[in-house]
Amino acid sequence: MYKFKTNLFLVIYFIAIFSIESSISSFNTEINSNSNSDFGHMEIPKNIEDIPFICYNNLSDSSYYLKNNQYFYEPISTIIDNSVSYFPNNCSNISDKNSLSCCLKIDSDQFKSTMDYITSDSLNTSVIGRLYDCRTNSSLGGGFKIVEDNGNTPDLETMSNELDVIDSRESVKICLSQLQQLQCFKCSQDHKTILRDFHTDLLYRIESDPNHQPLFYIKSSTFKHPIIDTSNDGFPTTGAGGADNTIHYIEKDISKGKSIAICNDYFEKLMSHCQFVNVRGKPLNQLFQPLNGKPAVFDSENYINEIFGITIPNLNEFVYVSSDNLDLFYVSNFNCFKQPIPNFQQPTCSLIINKKWYEKSQNSNDYNNNNDSDNSSFGISIQKYLNSFLNSFIIILIINIII
């Protein structure tokens, strides 16, 4: 009888151990599946806007090209003679797995200037998160650029000690982060398929003010021509003399430059977040307007056949030009830029009292960041498997006592 009890106990024990090990194995599989990078193995995207953008030769799989009359992304890469590549410190979202990195050393100074234009903590630059009145949606002056993980805005400037504002901190943080990451791809020498040719409606670019830089335009070989501002509205005219004899420099031949093409759905999310970010004096979603409200000229099959060697039906591509004629980009559904971006959530209202944020309902300065939900989910997963172990142990103990 004792031997039977012992064997029964061992059988129950091993069943419990097997149950626990299966739970742990399932847990590890769940964690590993969540941590796998999309760059390890990718399925051919079903939608042309789900095309990955990767540095040259990052994937061993070379099937990302025309297949079964479908059009997919394939990097077009050329190594420039006597050039030295480098990997920008600010661009952790891209990889440097080839001697041809995403940027050229000769562009490093200009790239740093462009990145600082967005990320600098100085509120004197032309990129800034603005404050808006909760009731009227009107601008309140002041603003901020830095949003810490806990919601603090150490560089916040206000025109009053107490404000009722739209709590745009999350969207401002997302917008500035996305613009920074976009610059990394814009700098790349490998992503030529997401670039478009210069559009003739952008006739000149004023370069006198370092705080006025294009966000989406990619420079190339140009020459600068001095001009003198003689008009009251600041429109440049050539020649000597004038009211203040302010000398500007313009790029007179910018037709060799390139503009980036942004995917439709990414563009909509980006502009939703960036409506709270002013660029060169205007909310970013208002700074750019579609040219004549019509698709760009590059929607002809002949153009696509010439450049990409394929025929693309239903190509939808618009050119967006800034109101100050400084910048342009394309919104497209073919070979366009796209990266992960959170969905836009309509912000609630908060109080700012002496430069500190408080929830209107509870007068609390707590601010939930996006990582809270992930940490909570992780904790729940661990707790679930610990509970499984504890339940198994209790069952074994009770049966052993009964026997």
Swiss-Prot record:
Keyword line: Glycoprotein, Membrane, Signal, Transmembrane, Transmembrane helix
CC terms in the record's Gene Ontology section: membrane
Membrane topology: Single-pass type I membrane protein
Extracellular side: 27-381
Transmembrane annotation, as ranges: 382-402
Superkingdom to which the source organism belongs: Eukaryota
Cytoplasmic side: 403
Signal peptide: 1-26
Glycosylation site list: N58, N90, N93, N124, N137, N371, N375
Compartment(s) where it occurs, according to its Swiss-Prot or TrEMBL record: Membrane
Name of the protein in its database record: Putative uncharacterized transmembrane protein DDB_G0288627
Organism: Dictyostelium discoideum (Social amoeba)
